[in-house]
Amino acid sequence: MLFVMLLAISAPIAQTGKPWLEWTMKETTKILNDSAWGQTQLETKQADAGPAAITNTGSSRTMVPRDASKDSPGAITSYIKYYIRLLSAKPVRQAVVRKLILDSPDISAQRKEELKSFAEATTSDFIVVAVVAEAKDRSMAGEALQAFKTATLESLKHSTYLERRDGKRLLLADFKAPVADGLGAKFVFPRTLNNQPFLEPGGGQLRFYCVLSKSIRLEARYRISDMMYDGRLEY
């Protein structure tokens, strides 16, 4: 049995109280996977539990897959996580670079400066949603990999969009399949609608939705009021 659960966002950490180059790995990971700009969608496979099976819900801390060797009815036997991030948001790019620096402390000064430029750039033309998949087993990983590999702008443009509270949508403008940069698949949207910024500070939410394949649907919701970062609405 497959079910999809969007993991709840806990309190945002728009400000950590220190420069991004001093973030810990824990702070960096939270920005990427559980923040106003990064969410985690978990899809699990359960041992056959029959028609009376119950879909579980919980937070990222409570939804820990059980031992795959114990395939009693309802036991989670496999899972895949989709990390859905607003890559055009500065805190996400800063977290990506900070994680790389923490993982590679011997990185050259020149490379570090190049990465800092990427992290601190201001995005004005596009909204970019990056999706990274992480699977427990090869079967689920293979299905996701194939879906990303074969997807095209043409196959996605009618079923992939960003939506705000009033129902207005931005349609997909470009799609880049995953490459060796570690950032995942990239879904590119225009930043304006009718020559006006798509989002303004305030309430409401931004919803990302994508039918990647017949069996894979991606969805994430971002609370606009939590997206303020260093005095700017970052998305």
Predicted regions span which residues?
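Bacterial N-terminal signal peptides
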Residues: 1-10
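PEST-like low-complexity, intrinsically disordered acidic/proline/serine-rich tracts
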Residues: 13-235
